[in-house]
Regions:
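N-terminal metal-binding scaffold of metallo-dependent hydrolase/deaminase domains
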Residues: 1-43, 119-162, 166-176
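Short, acidic/turn-prone active-site loops that include or flank metal/cofactor-
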Residues: 55, 67-70, 93, 112-116, ...
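Non-catalytic positions within long, well-ordered alpha-helices that form the structural scaffold/packing
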Residues: 73, 81-84
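Residue-level marker for well-ordered alpha-helical positions
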Residues: 74-75, 96, 142
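Alpha-helical segments flanking ligand/cofactor-binding loops in enzyme cores
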Residues: 78-81, 100, 146
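Residues at the N-termini of beta-strands
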Residues: 87-88, 153
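Active-site loop-helix segments enriched in His/Asp/Glu that coordinate
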Residues: 88-122
């Protein structure tokens, strides 16, 4: 099923000089299907479920520091998702169970920080390497998320708080 995530503003990258006002991102499964204005996407995808968010929608972030403290690895990973991140740096995911918890919900474990962005259908695709550990994907280089790239999105309100996080196409955090 397709989901059309609509926000006051869509940014392909957080430093995007030309955001799409009243824009949206279509998500099909775990992939991005299209990026554009609400009107054009609604016309192209009339059967898509629409989720409307107050704030700015853009690429999910990479959590670049120590993971928040919590009683369990699962809760530590969930705390990262609540911040709008769908990837963590490997150097901070060394505690027992953290990588398994990340893999279960689709959070990427990266060897280094990368710049994330949502590109148009003609953008550069992601390059990933699957490690020998089942279920863990280590992204060695991400130069953009294309129209067929993984759907990792975050929505932030005017105060900079994360309103929603989409990880590999799944809504994994929504602030009440």
């Amino acid at each position: 099923m397709e989901t059309l995530h609509v926000a006051d503003e869509v940014r392909r990258a957080w430093d995007d000089a030309e955001p799409i006002r009243g824009g949206g991102v279509v998500v099909t499964g775990d992939r991005i299907g299209a990026v554009g204005t609400f009107e054009e996407l609604r016309e192209r995808f009339p059967g898509a479920r629409v989720r409307t968010w107050a704030g700015v929608l853009g690429p999910a972030r990479v959590h670049e520091g120590p993971l928040p403290e919590a009683p369990t690895p699962r809760e530590r990973i969930h705390a990262v998702l609540k911040l709008g991140a769908t990837a963590v740096l490997a150097e901070y995911a060394t505690a027992p169970g953290l990588r398994d918890a990340a893999a279960r919900v689709g959070v990427l474990v990266l060897p280094v920080a990368v710049r994330t962005e949502i590109a148009g259908v003609t953008g550069v695709t992601e390059t990933a390497e699957v490690t020998g550990v089942t279920g863990i994907t280590t992204v060695t280089e991400v130069t953009g998320i294309t129209g067929t790239g993984r759907a990792d999105l975050a929505v932030f309100d005017a105060d900079g708080r994360c309103v929603a996080t989409v990880c590999a196409g799944r809504l994994v955090h929504r602030r009440a």
